[in-house]
Amino acid sequence: MKAILFSLLIGSSITTFAQSTDYVSQVWVADQGDGTYRNPVLYADYSDPDAIRVGDDFYLTSSSFGCLPGLQILHSKDLVNWQIVSAAIPYSLAPHTDTAPQHGNRVWAPCIRHHDGEFYIFWGDPDQGAFMTKAKDVKGPWSEPVLVKAGKGIIDTTPLWDEDGRVYMAHAYAGSRAGLKSVIAVCELNADATRAITQSRIIFDGHEAHETCEGPKFYKRNGYYYIFHPAGGVPTGWQVVQRSKNIYGPYEWRTVMAQGKSSVNGPHQGAWVDTANGEDWFLHFQDVGAAGRLVHLQPMKWVNDWPVIGVDEDGDGCGEPVLTYKKPAVAKQPICTPQESDEFNSNELGLQWQWNANIDEKWYFCNKEQGVLRLYSAPVTDDYKNLWDVPNMLLQKFPAPTFTATMKLKFNPIGKYYGERTGLVIMGMDYAGLMIENTEKGLVLSRTECKKADKGSAETVNKTVKLSSNEVYLRARIVTTGKKIKESEGGHDLVVECKLSYSKDGKKFKEIGETFQVKEGKWIGAKVGTFCTRPNIKSNDGGWVDIDWFRITK
């Protein structure tokens, strides 16, 4: 059991500090403490971000795809310091009978809005259509999602409440499902925004000038309807803004931000927000490959009713992204960051954690009394190939370009049969980990990896160690090298490497196996976390692993 004060292992040294409400990362802080910030303001995979201001508070959500809890919501007072405060989809996504992971499916490009005292989040499910959930309090409870408009390929939905009381929704199409992409459409919704009452009308075709236009965000200002959207592809694109006096067009457009001479490739979709004192800002993502899609904050200004995003040094109306800038002019706020480390001293899972699929309540027990998280071994399916297929993977986003993840665990398998496993995993379409398995020879620690896990490949083991104790410390060291990946794999992404090690006493760690090149997941960045499984054999119970703590350090 751990007290509120705890000792943090960093290599072989010990640092003691107290837990506080405002978590501050050891590995990435955007606020520089001198009135400036550095980008990314969120060095984590908050893909397709959208944000709003309500009073003096800012809220951000992002694509969660098939990960649960879904639609994590972050809160900030200054657009720089963010913490996770809730999730709009706490347990499962429709169809709720799904038990398998839905990699890259389900929740695409949400849009968060506040209207008439309620928070709304719209999103597209590429296989079902446009959904909406709402709540009076951003911390919930959130309503059961409503299918607003059914249709294959409807994605990137964004509502707009007009001054006359009518409600509209703009959206894009996923070519993989709809057979059409690079267009943006608008339909009208009923007054309570729960149902489309007209067919969608295509209002912009980007095939010639702005191919792969997607991710629209709908706004109205000074009598103009504005649609902000990216084009040109995720890693290589640019920001476009359209405007019209008529909601159905015709729209005129401008490119308002592009990479230019900056190092920020393909500044992609995001959100315009203003401060209470009238400053304008734009949050968007940058795809960096293995770590995912990172969130940047750009200054924004209006010139002749056109937005200019970033810094426009040549005055052509198209800005470039900044890497450092002065913070928004709001009241000074304490430095904080999204939660990472977890001492498991609560009766609820930390908001930084997500499972790989709809959540089964039998997977875990938050044992506050003992200060541990207990994961019960869940049986794999008969057609199990590798961990890509496992729903009870408990994972969190990479928090920085370079960091160390360490966990302390105690494995308690059922001795009468073999094959129960747990461990520390760096998860993506390729993955690697330290797996502890109950075998005929006792507990064995394996340095395991799986290339092309998403294609059903089998795991390989490059080193094993017999364990004399069921209590062990596992560690992953993640380093972004500065090198670029091969041109055949995209060329623009930075190489991220992982070294794995273990310890019997938490002081001396021994590296095991080879260096692993980290690979992203399906539309998401790589993640780090754990699991507990057993073979699919008939049994009325299984073993478990008690995780004492999980810590992110330098």
Regions found by a protein language model. Give the residues of each.
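Bacterial Sec-dependent N-terminal signal peptides
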Residues: 1-20
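Carbohydrate-active catalytic/glycan-binding domains of CAZyme proteins
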Residues: 19-554
